[in-house]
């Protein structure tokens, strides 16, 4: 009698992808000015500016996404380098319920950010001073495409996977 655990029936694979807009922009003019002022070779310095410096609203989304990823990693086990992680079937219902809450809250934060975005751009003009360039601020509808909260579930392969095959060899 074979009492070995069948990983394909006791676990599944899950992939989680959370994207957020960085609101960072390379300022080539400032980079060049610093290179010239410091006597460096061309393109030694890259000056990146935070387009929404001082607002903190986007930081809240980025931190929330990081916490969601950390929670996901705590609930799952590493499986592959492409982002797939192993989720025990026994944890699926709780995992999915919490994931739905995380997604709902993330989307609410994004909606709040997009609603405030025009005011945040106006505030950035004061924060950035001479570095402010209105053309670097896309329309809110374009910014909305920079945010996403996606996940997929897949069965654990039953053959053709090194981990599965090595397990069979030692049974």
Describe these PLM feature segments.
Residues 1-139:
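Leu/Val/Ala/Ile-rich N-terminal alpha-helices, chiefly Sec-type signal peptides and the beginnings
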Residues 138-164:
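Acidic, low-complexity proline/glycine-rich segments
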Residues 169-171:
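Conserved small/polar residues in nucleotide/adenosyl-binding loops
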């Amino acid at each position: 009698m074979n009492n070995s655990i069948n990983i394909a029936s006791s676990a599944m694979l899950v992939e989680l992808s959370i994207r957020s807009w960085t609101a960072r922009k390379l300022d080539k003019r400032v980079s060049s000015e610093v290179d010239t002022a410091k006597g460096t070779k061309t393109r030694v310095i890259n000056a990146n500016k935070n387009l929404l410096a001082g607002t903190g609203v986007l930081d809240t989304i980025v931190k929330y996404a990081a916490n969601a990823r950390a929670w996901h990693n705590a609930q799952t086990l590493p499986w592959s380098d492409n982002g797939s992680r192993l989720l025990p079937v026994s944890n699926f219902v709780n995992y999915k319920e919490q994931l739905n809450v995380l997604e709902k809250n993330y989307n609410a934060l994004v909606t709040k950010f997009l609603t405030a975005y025009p005011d945040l751009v106006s505030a950035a003009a004061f924060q950035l001073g001479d570095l402010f360039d209105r053309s670097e601020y896309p329309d809110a509808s374009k910014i909305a495409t920079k945010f996403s909260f996606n996940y997929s579930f897949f069965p654990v392969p039953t053959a053709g996977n090194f981990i599965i095959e090595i397990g069979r060899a030692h049974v």
